UniProtKB/Swiss-Prot annotation:
The keyword Glycoprotein does not apply. One of the primary rRNA binding proteins, it binds directly to 16S rRNA central domain where it helps coordinate assembly of the platform of the 30S subunit. PROSITE patterns: RIBOSOMAL_S8. Keywords: Chloroplast, Plastid, Ribonucleoprotein, Ribosomal protein, RNA-binding, rRNA-binding. This is Small ribosomal subunit protein uS8c. It is found in: Plastid, Chloroplast. Signal peptide: none annotated. One of its GO terms (molecular function) is rRNA binding. GO terms for cellular component: chloroplast; ribonucleoprotein complex; ribosome. The keyword Lipoprotein does not apply. The lineage of its organism: Eukaryota, Discoba, Euglenozoa, Euglenida, Spirocuta. It comes from Euglena gracilis. Pfam families: Ribosomal_S8. Belongs to the universal ribosomal protein uS8 family.
């Protein structure tokens, strides 16, 4: 059975959809991807998301459920609110940081998403709660 990195898959799907200025993108439904979508919506990077009824039967007979993420654009030229997404901690090389060493992204415009003992949270929330964790990705 193939093991995929759902975070990298999600970020790549969003990145590719932004390149073609798509309005929505389907991402594999896991607790982790739903929590990431909630953070992105709360911080204003995406418009909304919903649990899709669509399922897909893979070659192995596994049923995959998806969530639909609605991307957010501004102006008549349809400029995305997301400029760049950078994956930091990968399955082959995990990256951890204490709350004291967390740096602001893009001069405070962007954010860092962390996996902590209290769940997923942004760098600002981690600093205020004095919790460190695994740095999943940067977004600005």
């Amino acid at each position: 059975m193939t093991n995929i990195d759902v975070i990298s898959d999600m970020l790549t799907r969003i990145r590719n959809s932004l390149l073609i200025k798509a309005r929505k993108v389907n991402v594999i439904n896991t607790k982790l991807t739903v929590n990431i979508a909630e953070i992105l919506k709360k911080e204003g990077f995406i418009d909304s998301f919903e649990l899709a009824d669509a399922t897909c039967l893979t070659e192995n007979g596994v049923i995959k459920k998806y969530i639909t993420i609605f991307l957010k654009y501004k102006g008549p030229k349809q400029v995305s609110y997301i400029t760049k997404i950078k994956r930091v901690s990968k399955p082959g090389l995990r990256t951890y940081s204490s709350y004291k060493r967390l740096q602001s992204v893009a001069g405070g415009v962007g954010l860092t998403v962390l996996s902590t003992s209290k769940g997923l949270m942004t760098d600002r929330l981690a600093r205020s709660n004095k919790i460190g964790g695994e740095i999943l990705f940067y977004i600005w």
